[in-house]
Every structure is written in structure tokens, then in C-alpha cells.
Amino acid sequence: MLSGSIVALLTPFKADGEVDFDGLQKLVEYHIAAGTNGIVAVGTTGESSTLTVEEHVKVVNKTVEFVNGRIPVIAGTGANATHESVTFSRLLNDSGIDACLSVTPYYNKPTQEGLFQHYKAIAEVSNVPQILYNVPGRTAVDLLPEPVARLAELENIVALKDATGDLNRVAIHRELCGEDFILLSGDDATGLDFVKLGGQGVISVTNNIAAKDMADMFRLALEGRFEEAEVINQRLMPLHKNLFIESSPIPVKWAATQLGLIECGHLRLPLTELSEKCHPIVAQAMTDAGIY
């Protein structure tokens, strides 16, 4: 169910800062037409930290409605307070989502045992599969392989999104967690190599603006056609790198606006729009990738 190129979907806003649900539906249709293998709603790229609880739940519910069972929908449910992640999980239990993606608690820097207990508490209240999400560059805490292996023994913890960029961990996680545990890259620049080493796919920022290329690349990779996949990967590499020239999702939201995928590139503070000096860099990356 969870494999291939999964998009970490943008949340489009109107100029007044309200969520643009018509724009959200347009994005969903773009991804389904392009062959995207799944959608993460209200993750980091979806600006989860600046949405209210009500907005968060509504964006997930609307995404499920718009997708209408055509591809899996994964809901972001991460927070740095366990009770908040538990609340999101309970609120979304009957939403029709296919899985939840929960980032490690950020800022408060829990121990490895604290991380284990955090995810265990979420798993105990959720009736949908759970995806662990490790991105120490944003959270200041690293979920190590040993607690991942303990968590993988729990019935509804089925996957890990690994955004460390440490490719050595693919084999470590596979050995510790078993063949049935799903490993997804959270780093576009190393995503293809991640699959070459035994991962099942990527949760991608680049996918927001190069959906067909990403879907094709990971389809080829999962078929073992790595040389063909690498040709696409090298063409997209300027995007993989320059979509992080400022904090994501700032660059990708600007790029999506330039491509007409969303009407407004508004972000909620403290995120601000892409610096003007970065416009030509991101535009050139899109040109080099053949999408602009």
C-alpha cells in the first residue's frame, strides 16, 4: 500500500490566509493524473504547525473526500506533546485515511525511551497504520534504530519515514525490523539510493511540482530498472537541492505558484515568501529539470 512516490502535499492558502479548498482539490487531481502513489496531508510541507486543530482535521477530511479512494491518504498527526498527537489520532480515526505520519516530538528533546513511549501511546489509540517520522535536522532529536525495532513489534506501527539522509540505516532498519516493515525515504536527494538499498519509496517535496517524473522514477526503481531511474534522478537533482535553498516549504510553494499549480503562494508566519534573490536559482532548477 505504501510505496513509490508519495507527495508531502502543500496546503494552498488564499491571499487572506484562509485555506484554499478549491486549490487543494486541484492539487489532488494533478497528483492522481500524474501517477503519484499517495498523498500526505498536513505534514511539514503542508504547514501543519500553523494550522488550527479545526483546519488540520478539515484539510485531512477534504483530502480524503477529493481523493475518493483512488490512492492512499496519509494524515500528518505529529506534535511535540504526546497528548496532542493522541488527540489528532482520535479525531481522525474515522476519517477514512489509510495511515498516520507522526514526526518525533520537536524542541523538548525526549530520550529514546520517551520517543518509544510517545509512539506507543499513539498506537494504542489509533485504529489506522502508523508511520514513524525521523527528521533530526528539524526536530533536534534522532530516533535511533533500536527503539524503531521495538516500535515495529507493535501491531499498527508499520513504517518509518527516514529523513536523516543516512543511507547506512536502510540495512540496519531492515535487519532489526524485518522484511515486512516499510521503509520510506524523507530525503529527495538520496531517495533513489534509499530504494536501491531496500527501501520501498519516498515521501517527497519535489513531487509537488514534478509529480509525473517522480512517479516514473520510483516505478522504474521498484521494477529494478535503476539505470533508467537514475537518468530522471539526475535531471531532477537541481530541484532536490534547491527546493531547500530556504526552509521548506518556502521554495516549493513559490515554484508551484510559478507553474500555476496553486494560485497564491501565501505562507503563514513565521514562514515568509521566498527571498527575491532566490527566485532565479529556483527558476533555473525548474528549467534544468525540464518542468519550466
From Swiss-Prot:
> Pathway membership of this protein?
Amino-acid biosynthesis; L-lysine biosynthesis via DAP pathway; (S)-tetrahydrodipicolinate from L-aspartate: step 3/4
> If you read the UniProt record, what top EC class would you report for this enzyme, in one word?
lyase
What subunit structure does UniProt give? Homotetramer; dimer of dimers.
Organismal lineage: Bacteria, Pseudomonadati, Pseudomonadota, Gammaproteobacteria, Vibrionales
Keywords on this record?
Amino-acid biosynthesis, Cytoplasm, Diaminopimelate biosynthesis, Lyase, Lysine biosynthesis, Schiff base
The family this protein is said to belong to: Belongs to the DapA family.
HAMAP family of this UniProt entry? DapA (MF_00418)
For this protein, the record's InterPro entries field holds: Aldolase_TIM, DapA, DapA-like, Schiff_base-form_aldolases_AS, Schiff_base-form_aldolases_CS
Signal sequence range: none
Catalytic reaction(s) noted = L-aspartate 4-semialdehyde + pyruvate = (2S,4S)-4-hydroxy-2,3,4,5-tetrahydrodipicolinate + H2O + H(+)
Protein name as it appears in the record: 4-hydroxy-tetrahydrodipicolinate synthase
Q: Where does pyruvate bind?
A: T45, I203
What EC number(s) is this enzyme filed under?
4.3.3.7
Q: Which residues does this entry assign to the site Part of a proton relay during catalysis?
A: T44, Y107
Q: What does this chain do? A: Catalyzes the condensation of (S)-aspartate-beta-semialdehyde [(S)-ASA] and pyruvate to 4-hydroxy-tetrahydrodipicolinate (HTPA).
**Subcellular localization, per the record?**
Cytoplasm
Write the gene name.
dapA
* Organism for this UniProt entry: Vibrio vulnificus (strain CMCP6)
A single GO BP term for this record reads: lysine biosynthetic process via diaminopimelate
Q: In the UniProt record, does the keyword Transferase occur? A: no
The active site consists of Y133 (proton donor/acceptor), K161 (schiff-base intermediate with substrate)
Supply one GO molecular-function term: 4-hydroxy-tetrahydrodipicolinate synthase activity
Q: Give me the Gene Ontology terms describing cellular component.
A: cytosol
Q: Which PANTHER family match?
A: 4-HYDROXY-2-OXOGLUTARATE ALDOLASE, MITOCHONDRIAL (PTHR12128:SF66), DIHYDRODIPICOLINATE SYNTHASE (PTHR12128)
Among Pfam families, the record links this protein to: DHDPS (PF00701)
